[in-house]
Regions:
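Entry/capping segment at the start of metal-dependent catalytic domains
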Residues: 1-35
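Two-metal-ion RNase H-like nuclease active-site motif
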Residues: 2-11, 169-171, 409-412
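Short coil/turn segments at beta-strand junctions that form active-site/ligand-binding loops
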Residues: 1-3, 80, 97-99, 405-406
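Anionic group-transfer/hydrolysis microenvironments
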Residues: 10-12, 21-24, 105-107, 112, ...
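Short secondary-structure boundary/capping segments
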Residues: 21-23, 116-123, 290-291
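Residue-level signal for well-ordered alpha-helical scaffold segments within enzymatic catalytic domains
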Residues: 19, 112-117, 201, 205, ...
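Conserved "right-hand" nucleotidyltransferase catalytic core of DNA-directed polymerases
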Residues: 10, 188-194, 204-212, 219-412
Length: 412
């Protein structure tokens, strides 16, 4: 039996929270909906049903540690275990239970934060110092995520990555390849740079009813007195002065009066994760099926990564070679001749394209940036740019409106 939950972690200098939502219950609450929720239900009805979804919300602050051990216990109970089941005929059986936690960018952030929390919760005298350590670790993760070498060489991050969490992970950020949702070319080198899509962008695609961006009210005298005035660099500063510094909200201190809005924001993010599952269930089922059929871990893999893992598994089985014996083997090329990669069956009927084909067969490139090869072809009234990135038509910006008198044909 698999217990599925979605979760999200939030950290501030004085507060740490984790929100869990029961995925099965969420799906049951909206089982009658097809497509986006807003296509079927009113906002009022959506909110009503969301309020009824099973949620578990935990937070600790520098002044409130009442939920600390509850959170630790909640996480530890996710360890794989057996439960005793008795059917109507009094037959007793042992049923294996595991927890699968769904999230967004969990492999590179939330899982590490949970691991660090479980490694550290009993090492500090009070939650003030525990949260300080969690906050500093969070900043380190964010700082190093664009530097993969430093990220994987950092001792603290490595310990968290290797920590055996009590649950299995399904990272939808990876599943839907949102870590490389689009790309741009570096203007100097031509190198392809991947661009990710955040949860807020995803919520727009899902037509989610509420687009939330967490925003704290301006710093007031209470926050200055309790926190900022105790920091040497801000001692004597007014609230107005500190507000003008443009401090990020996630680097602010969450006063008790702001806890509920923060938790609502956190829960909304988790609901969006659940909605991703509801709208794309086949993608999730596919990964469970492949994992069961082939015994490879693909719950957090994009389709391209699944194909690579499958091919590696099947090739290893067919050849008897260990994956490490062939995965890194490759042919290093300093020169690429187009003649070697243009298939012989490619032929054209028009003289213009026949000449183009022959000229391209004579081309050799020594790098793959945008300046290595580029040519423009004017064919049947449309200009095309052929380069290392592919072929694209060159069109002037315009708006074309069809009617019964005109048929617009584009050869691209």
């Amino acid at each position: 039996m698999i217990v599925s939950k979605a979760f999200d972690v939030e950290i501030f200098p004085n507060l740490f929270s984790v929100t869990f939502v029961d995925v099965k219950d969420y799906l049951q609450k909206f089982a009658d909906c097809k497509g986006a929720l807003t296509d079927t239900l009113t906002v009022k009805e959506i909110k009503k049903r969301l309020d009824e979804v099973k949620c578990d919300v935990f937070y600790i602050s520098d002044t409130d540690d009442s939920q600390l051990l509850n959170l630790v216990s909640y996480l530890n109970k996710m360890q794989a275990h057996y439960i005793t089941n008795e059917d109507k005929d009094a037959n007793i059986s042992q049923v294996p239970v595991r927890y699968d936690l769904f999230g967004f960018n969990t492999l590179n952030y939330d899982n590490l934060m949970i691991a660090f929390f479980l490694m550290s919760f009993n090492r500090y005298d009070n939650t003030k110092y525990l949260i300080k350590a969690l906050y500093e670790f969070s900043k380190k993760i964010i700082r190093l995520q664009d530097d993969h070498e430093a990220f994987y060489q950092d001792n603290q991050v490595t310990l968290a990555r290797k920590y055996r969490l009590p649950f299995a992970s399904v990272d939808l950020f990876k599943v839907f390849h949102l870590d490389a949702a689009s790309a741009r070319a570096d203007k100097d080198t031509g190198e392809r740079i991947k661009l990710s899509k955040g949860l807020k962008g995803v919520s727009i695609n899902l037509k989610w009813y509420e687009l939330l961006d967490f925003k704290l009210p301006p710093i007031d005298e209470e926050e200055v007195k309790l926190y900022w005035s105790n920091k040497p660099e801000y001692k004597g500063c007014t609230a107005a002065f500190i507000n003008n510094l443009g401090i990020n909200d996630f680097d602010r201190y969450v006063l008790p009066k702001y806890v509920e809005p923060m938790l609502h924001y956190n829960k909304n993010d988790v609901f969006i994760v659940c909605e991703m599952i509801r709208q794309k269930p086949d993608e999730i089922k596919l990964r469970y099926s492949i994992e069961h059929a082939f015994g490879i871990h693909v719950l957090s893999s994009a389709r391209s990564d699944i194909s690579k893992k499958l091919l590696t598994k099947l090739y290893s089985k067919a050849t008897g070679l260990s994956p490490r014996d062939f995965e890194k083997k490759r042919t290093e090329r300093t020169k690429l001749s187009f003649k070697k990669i243009i298939f012989p069956h490619i032929k054209f009927k028009t003289k213009q394209l026949q000449d183009l084909l022959e000229s391209m067969k004579k081309v050799s490139i020594y790098r793959t940036n945008k300046d290595s090869f580029s040519t423009v072809v004017d064919f049947m009234g449309t200009k095309y740019n052929i380069a290392t990135g592919g072929i694209h038509s060159i069109d002037a910006p315009r708006e074309l409106r069809s009617n019964d008198k005109y048929l617009y044909i584009h050869h691209d």
